[in-house]
Amino acid sequence: MKKHIKTLKKKLKIFDSKLKEECGVFGISNTKDASALTALGLHALQHRGQEGCGIVTFNGKQYFSEKRFGLVGDNFNKEKVLKKLQGDYAIGHNRYSTTGENTLRNIQPFFADLHIGGLSIAHIGNLTNALLLREILVKDGAIFRTTSDTETIVQLVAKSKREKFLDKLIDALFQIQGGYSLVLMTNKKLVGVRDPLGIRPLVIGKLKNSYIFASETCALDIVGAKFIREVENGEVIIIENEIITSIKPFPKQKPRPCVFEYIYFARPDSLINNKCAYEYRKCLGAKLAEETDIDADLIVPVPDSGVPAALGYAEQSNKKFELGLIRNHYVGRTFIEPTQSIRSLGVKLKLSSTRTIVKNKKVILIDDSLVRGTTCHKIVKMLYESGAKEVHVRIACPEIKYPDFYGVDMPTKEELLAHEKSNKEMCEYIKAKSLKFLSLGGLYNALIKEKRNLNYPQFSDHYFTGEYPIKPHDNLNGLKIKQLSLLSAKSNN
């Protein structure tokens, strides 16, 4: 049965043209409920990765690990499982594979028994020079057990000639490049790290006498923790004996956080710069209405991620907001064999239209982004089949023309609809009456009320501009995974 479910999920991916999240991390210190609280934190971060989850704990003498495929609630919902994870310190990880094969050995957190003591690590993001470093390490005798770029960090720490753990870690950090956030646990420390540009997110909070690192503030909320602040770009925070130490080993740089945390990735109730992601998305929708409004009867969001932008659009344009599409949240857990007839249903397994709402209406369909366009094409068709008079598509971000190399699972450049097609060609492909995107200037105005700095953009906005904040050394796609697999096999022979 599990094989059937896994096969169905794999088949359904061809109907899901959204960008994919880049994993979630959680770490907590000094609490007897470390494993249970970590499971709760990971549950709140489930949207960031659904392929696998893991927790590692430390009880002062020994490390305990549990890693499984699937959702947190399906794997860490039994008391007997959590009781096995003994200790007052814990770190956890939700996986969505952006590099490395989808195998149990690639599920984090990773653990290594180094000569200086145990080390466990959970990582979100991608290292753009991971393949290069891996080749060097393998030639130097390193043996890799996984195809994940996270293990590269562990190997660099192990190889460092520095004596103390923190010095070894910093030595490793100076060798890696990319967008990343790390939570690490040793015999005596809980450590949080954010990349020099702050591309990937990390926050710190407090719960009684415990400190917590998490990818988003929603993970702090679920355990009742107080949000302290975001970990700054290039910052390393060490928690030892419940004393916080902050160091910034990298040369100072202005932050360039991933703009898609604002647009799509972060849960709507999570704080970014002390403002809910939901509010940013409403502002994007309002600005979209300012730039692209047209005569219509209804504003209809693509659920769930298109809802905030659609609300902002409706308020700004003074048009009626309706749930013209209903999402089935349980499709990923359907216990059926995916026959061709089932697969042909496509997007209807996930969405259905409220036909009496859209019938004979001019509809403005709002979504947060347009990637391949396959899902949008099917939704537009569905609305017309339900009797819509016109369907106008409005996208609350600029055209996505370039791939990501910092931890987001997304199509190659050639698969991106906007990479080579004109607006007219894209509109013809999705079969809409019209298609408009939020401008790049409108995006910046909506998010920070500023113009884009042409010399040093305030965000990592390479999806739209092709201006990468860090040179992508490695080819982070299927080719890289194959190369990593070959290197892994070579290092294990």
For the regions a language model picked out, list residue spans one by one.
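Conserved short alpha-helical segments that host acidic/polar catalytic motifs at enzyme active sites
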Residues: M1-N233, I238-A296, V302, E390
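Flexible loop/turn segments at secondary-structure boundaries
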Residues: D33-S35, T98-T99, N129, I199-R200, ...
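A conserved beta-strand->alpha-helix junction
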Residues: F76, T146, E151, F321-G332, ...
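Secondary-structure transition/capping motifs at alpha-helix termini
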Residues: A142, R162-E163, D293-D297, E315-E322, ...
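Amphipathic alpha-helical
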Residues: T152-K164, P303, E315-R333
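PRPP-dependent phosphoribosyltransferase catalytic core
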Residues: L173, K188-K189, G224-E230, K381-N493
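Extended, hydrophobic alpha-helical segments in both membrane/secreted and soluble proteins
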Residues: I299, G306-Y313, S317, F321, ...
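Short, glycine/charge-rich flexible loops or terminal/linker lids adjacent to PRPP-binding catalytic cores
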Residues: N318-V363, T374, K401-V408
